[in-house]
Regions:
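Short, linear, compositionally biased motifs with a strong N-terminal bias
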Residues: 10-13
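Lipid interaction determinants
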Residues: 20-78, 88-153
Length: 153
């Protein structure tokens, strides 16, 4: 009987530790502003859940370069311009299409994470981590129009 009690305590302790709050990118980082958005970013979670597709985005000098492997086997590149007005991020593709929504959020104070919260009826929170976009993705990407394949943004 004593063994069963010890086993029950061990299982309870394991469950308490295993169910504790996770650290890392799935939790929403402290959000600053978009002042430090000019960087390269990799999507790590959507509404706190790790994604099973690949999206990279680079922001530089008012331009964005979106590399995604979402609806295809290959990475697809979308390019365009972005603006930040009143703490809201918007983008337009070079072929004239607009992002599906605008975003609020910002870069974490330590510069490691970018949080984008969609301005939709049911907002979605996207967490990106600062990174360097792999050269093989940049060099082998297919360029496309925003109307040919559904872009992530």
């Amino acid at each position: 009987m004593k063994i069963f009690k010890m086993l029950a305590v061990a299982v309870a302790m394991f469950c308490a530790v295993a169910c504790g709050e996770k650290e890392g990118p799935s939790n929403t980082p402290t959000v600053g502003s978009f002042d430090a958005i000019e960087n390269e970013w990799k999507l790590v979670s959507v509404d706190g859940v790790a994604n099973d597709f690949s999206v990279y985005i680079s922001f530089t000098d008012g331009l964005f370069f979106l590399y995604q492997q979402v609806y295809s086997w290959d990475y697809v590149l979308y390019e365009g311009e972005y603006t930040i007005e009143g703490g809201v991020l918007n983008g337009t593709y070079f072929d004239g299409g607009e992002w599906k929504t605008a975003y609020t959020g910002g870069v974490s104070e330590d510069g490691k994470y970018l949080t984008l919260k969609s301005k939709e009826a049911t907002p979605v929170t996207y967490i990106y981590e600062a990174c360097t976009i792999p050269e093989d993705i940049v060099n082998e990407v297919s360029r496309t129009r925003a109307t040919e394949v559904v872009p992530f943004l």
